[in-house]
């Protein structure tokens, strides 16, 4: 998961940053729709860019971002405390539950707290357990495709890309499918706080209420698991024990919120962005359709897996990951001072020509497994095996059912976020196979 708080910190500037000719306006609709030409320029002219608007450093080169991911001692993942400290006291009072539970998310932790939480949750959330979910993921995908019925025009996000990951995580946690609308609403409202690049007291109140509601929702289900264990991930989390170390009630609630939120928001964008890319490269769409519909099942699965990696590289769901400078040091001649914030633009790294030949071309035969969409190092996304699996199941299933998929209407509107890269809606026209 790549969820962080992305609005500018109050105050703070760096004296050593020379004025750049580049004016990075992340909220500009044109930049939200297509940031890649500007990222190309930043990568060439100012790869360690100081943004006065964000009061932060912005990195765009693959090697620099990978290096930062491997230096947890110099680059801290604990970006909540400086963010909360920057909020005026009156605003901070409005987000007590957000602070309570987000501060327990492992994505905002450094060692040793991160190590402990990762060790515990890794016992139940790993590649083998994710692969065991394949039949359920396929059942959910087929159910959603069946629900589309005979429609030839529909919003791909609301009909498929949105509900799929939410239903998958709900099935894993063992919460009722009938709660989908409530769960999605709570997740979307929390996203207003975590992913938005604009400050708004209204969004604080909305996200705080949603966090409180989701916490009570999971508290109820956790209590049920203690008295009547089930065969689901939530029961496994409740029963975790590593030499006497267990998750506290607040840690259990925070972890469930994290899994649901991350699994929903990020994977929705993964599936939607991937489908948009396939509509823009129709030859690649047809290639994926043909090469995942043969009688050779192992070959189908192998190509589907490779195709998903390329879709994640080309236009993945992650805008940025964030670090806080823990030790003053230099990067490409720029002095990064302790306490300053650093945005690692993952989607820019994935288009770096030093890492990929013809990076702005979608090539499903490319070996794209080295992409940084899920991060790298200690903080690589815990749920990346599940996100990959959902793509490996979803795209072949959709392309088997539909002989063609194309976008309709005006260009999609992209969400105003530095953290997430996704659209509000994706109207499509399909022709049934």
Spell out what each predicted region is:
Residues 1-433:
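Cytochrome P450
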């Amino acid at each position: 998961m790549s969820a962080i708080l992305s609005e500018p910190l109050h105050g703070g500037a760096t004296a050593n940053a020379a004025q750049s000719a580049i004016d990075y306006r992340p909220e500009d609709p044109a930049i939200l729709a297509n940031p890649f030409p500007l990222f190309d320029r930043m990568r060439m002219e100012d790869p360690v860019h100081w943004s006065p608007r964000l009061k932060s450093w912005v990195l765009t080169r693959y090697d620099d971002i990978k290096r930062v991911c491997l230096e947890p001692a110099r680059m801290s993942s604990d970006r909540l405390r400086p963010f909360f400290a920057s909020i005026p006291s009156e605003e901070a009072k409005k987000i007590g539950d957000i602070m309570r539970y987000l501060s327990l998310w492992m994505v905002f932790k450094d060692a040793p707290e991160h190590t402990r939480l990762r060790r515990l949750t890794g016992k139940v959330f790993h590649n083998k357990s994710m692969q065991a979910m394949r039949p359920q993921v396929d059942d959910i995908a087929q159910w959603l495709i069946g629900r589309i019925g005979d429609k030839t025009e529909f919003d791909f996000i609301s009909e498929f890309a949105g509900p799929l990951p939410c239903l998958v995580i709900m099935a894993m946690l063992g919460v009722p499918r009938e709660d989908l609308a409530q769960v999605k609403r709570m997740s979307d409202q929390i996203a207003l706080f975590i992913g938005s690049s604009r400050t708004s007291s209204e969004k604080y109140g909305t996200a705080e209420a949603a966090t409180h509601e989701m916490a009570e929702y999971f508290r109820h289900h956790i209590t049920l698991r203690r008295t009547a264990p089930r065969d689901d991930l939530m029961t496994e989390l409740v029963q975790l024990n590593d030499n006497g170390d267990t998750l506290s009630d607040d840690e259990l609630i925070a972890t469930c919120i994290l899994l649901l939120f991350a699994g929903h928001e990020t994977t929705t964008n993964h599936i939607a962005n991937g489908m948009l890319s396939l509509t823009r490269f129709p030859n690649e769409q047809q290639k994926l359709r043909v090469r995942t519909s043969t009688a050779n099942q192992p070959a189908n699965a192998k190509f589907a897996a490779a195709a998903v990696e390329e879709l994640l590289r080309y236009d993945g769901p992650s805008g940025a990951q964030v670090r806080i400078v823990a030790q003053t040091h230099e990067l490409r001649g720029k002095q990064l001072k302790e306490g300053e914030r650093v945005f690692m633009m993952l989607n820019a790294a994935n288009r770096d020509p030093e890492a990929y030949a013809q990076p702005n071309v979608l090539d499903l035969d490319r070996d794209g497994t080295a992409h940084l969409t899920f991060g790298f190092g200690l903080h690589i996304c815990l749920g990346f095996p599940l996100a990959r699996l959902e793509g490996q199941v979803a795209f072949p299933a959709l392309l088997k059912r539909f002989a063609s998929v194309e976008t309709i209407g005006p260009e999609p509107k992209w969400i105003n976020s530095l953290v997430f890269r996704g659209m509000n809606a994706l109207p499509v026209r399909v022709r049934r196979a």
